């Protein structure tokens, strides 16, 4: 958040756009709280993930160790191709829909920045075969937000992408 704030200020972005960029930076990894994702980050160990003081953002696995990653993903039961960005976007969309006042930034751009921060969601996130039905919970601006999983392909994301590109 702080780095994004500095960049947004140095670029002279207007306040609503600045707010959007800062919030996207703060919230883009919310979906990593998924228990399967956390287990994967802990090398496939759900017990270590559950006992952790706070969720990990990175695994610490060597980036080139593909076999270790595949083993961790398999042990964690994280679906192949799962995207934490989809979960982050869903949590933020739920947060926005529950706000008592209108979001002070650009809600469509916010959701798109979150969904696309690893290069996907242009216009759609890839489909994932996810049989893990559960509810994902995260804290956004001090409020608990939930979203049901799995999240399917949302064609409305392509419409949003088109609207953003038409601006």
Model-predicted segments: where are they?
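Divalent metal-dependent catalytic cores for phosphoryl transfer on phosphate-bearing substrates
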Residues: 12-167
């Amino acid at each position: 958040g702080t780095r994004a704030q500095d960049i947004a200020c140095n670029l002279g972005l207007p306040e609503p756009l600045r707010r959007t960029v800062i919030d996207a930076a703060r919230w883009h990894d919310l979906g990593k709280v998924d228990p399967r994702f956390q287990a994967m980050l802990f090398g496939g160990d759900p017990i270590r993930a559950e006992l952790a003081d706070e969720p990990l953002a990175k695994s610490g696995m060597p980036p080139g160790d593909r076999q270790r990653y595949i083993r961790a993903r398999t042990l964690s039961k994280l679906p192949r191709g799962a995207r934490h960005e989809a979960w982050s976007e869903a949590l933020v969309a739920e947060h926005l829909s529950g706000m008592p006042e209108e979001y002070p930034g650009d809600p469509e751009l916010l959701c798109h920045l979150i969904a696309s921060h690893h290069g996907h969601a242009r216009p759609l996130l890839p489909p994932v075969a996810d049989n893990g039905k559960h509810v994902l919970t995260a804290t956004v601006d001090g409020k608990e937000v939930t979203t049901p999983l799995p999240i399917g392909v949302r064609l409305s994301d392509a419409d949003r992408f088109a609207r953003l590109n038409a601006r």
